[in-house]
Amino acid sequence: MIVIFCVIVKCEFFCIFTFIFGCFIIEADLWPAVFVACCTIIKMGRCNMCIFITAIIFKLKCIFKGRHGSMPIAMKSSRHNYQLTFLFKVNCVFISLPGGNKGFLLRLLSLAQPPVNF
């Protein structure tokens, strides 16, 4: 439903709101897929920066929740963690990031989580 609305309206603000909303409200295993779909379909320039912001928010959320004994779903399973990392890497490939941002994001993800082997 969110993806369909994004496609119809094609509004950057709604796309950003969806991503931030997903970080805090939607379960950790669902929101990355929602935003990847939104950005891939809409391919808006400003969505690129949302990837960086949300990746950082996601990491902080995992750290914060972990310290309080209530880890998000993605932190409970290392395999699922790898899948989320792969989702972000796939998103980098399909969405054209300006300049060296693609390399920076991949380095950020490599430092944050172990590499995915396929």
Curated annotation (Swiss-Prot):
List where in the cell it is found: Membrane
Write the record's keywords in alphabetical order, separated by commas. Membrane, Transmembrane, Transmembrane helix
- Give the superkingdom in one word: Eukaryota
Where is the chain membrane-spanning? 7-27, 34-58
> A single GO CC term, please?
membrane
The record describes its membrane topology as:
Multi-pass membrane protein
Q: What else is known?
A: Partially overlaps DNF1.
This protein is called: Putative uncharacterized membrane protein YER165C-A
Organism annotation: Saccharomyces cerevisiae (strain ATCC 204508 / S288c)
What lineage, starting at the top, does this entry show?
A: Eukaryota, Fungi, Dikarya, Ascomycota, Saccharomycotina
